Amino acid sequence: MSDVGEIAADRLKSFVERIERLEEEKSGLQEDIKEVYSEAKGTGFDVKIIRQIIRLRKMDKADRQEQRAILEMYEEALGMTE
């Protein structure tokens, strides 16, 4: 293999190994997150609601407000408001 080919192969191998390490870390983090959800559930918190809160916290404030307004409009249209 030429020097250029060896360099490209080395870089490719480096990228693949980095991705593999990150995938392993990601897997470990997902297990940690799962444990935290289990702990919260064991304490009496509703995990579905916690997941919704986390999703909402990731959103921009304007997007959250828009989503809430649309939800309220749909609830009214379906006669679900009190």
From Swiss-Prot:
* Keyword Glycoprotein among UniProt keywords: no
Q: Which domain of life is it from?
A: Bacteria
For the keyword Metal-binding, the answer is no
What Gene Ontology molecular function terms does this protein carry? DNA binding
Q: Which UniProt keywords apply?
A: Plasmid
Q: Which cysteines are joined by disulfide bonds?
A: none
One Pfam match, given by its short name, reads: GapR_DNA-bd
Known NCBIfam families for this protein?
PRK13694.1
**HAMAP family xrefs:** UPF0335
Concerning its family, UniProt says: Belongs to the UPF0335 family.
Tell me what this protein is called: UPF0335 protein pRhico085
